[in-house]
Amino acid sequence: MKGKRKTAQDALQHVYKITRDRGVLFYRKEDHIVYFTMQSVLSRRYRLRVLGTSHMYTHVHEGAFPEDIVQLSEYEHDLSSIFAKEYNREVGRSGSLFERPYGSAPKRSDKERRSCMVYIFNNPVEKKLVQRAQEDRWNFLAYYENDYPFSKRPFIRYSRKQLVDAIHLVEHEFRAGRYLGYKMLHRVFAELNAVEREQLTDFIIQLYFFFDRRACEDLFGSIPQMIKATELTTGKEFDVGEEFDPYSDVPYREMCAIVEKHGLMGAGMPFLHLPEERQMKLASFLMQHTGATPWQVARFLHREESRFR
């Protein structure tokens, strides 16, 4: 990701951002929602045309049409900086979160642009998290033609007061031009049942949805054709500086489920702050009960791999 950055006003920029220590970034819904709503607020503030994004466990992909290098750089700088502050407060850490500079590569022909967007959407498929791109929530592909792809649309008059209040609070924050922070999300999710949490998550994503559907239609012909393209090919990207990792991301999902089941995935991420002896026991347990390799456990716990060999 080193070297002079290339850009052009008519080029689709493929942006790639990974954590500095290559550790897991997105563990829970809250992590995705905070980052996604920041993307939404800041892309509108900078008037950046974003076609799509994909949140993976350790990194983020994004496809956007910037007016110039300054617009893209300022947007990415603010996004990384503001999210790092919010995330650091949540997990009790300090310092920058993402590797700098971020990776980017311009795509000037329509063929390159289509291949880039298909690659971004298909990241969860490549990492064996889903069979089809639209089955993954955090590449947001399903939301291009469906407001509630992972839940049933809530009807306010028949919904519990807790869900109605949560919806109104989210609407208020959206109208005020604010992203959703961890404290607010922890509070509202704690008052909802499992079905309502899914409904609220879908509501948040469709409300804050900021991707340029028109640009996607111009590129692929239509949204259904764009989705179909993700089923016909995986797309290819070689010039964005992405770390090569041939392994499945399923172990990360399995480890998240285990840690959550044991009550260690809540506010503050308690599992990251366990005493040394307990964390070593947790690492051993995770390796025994998932398909995780030692280096995946190390990335999950933000530790050196040599400690778990």
Regions found by a protein language model. Give the residues of each.
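Short Pro-Cys-Gly-centered "Cys-loop" motif that presents a nucleophilic cysteine in a tight turn
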Residues: M1-G52, P66-R309
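Short, charge-patterned binding micro-sites
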Residues: G52-H59
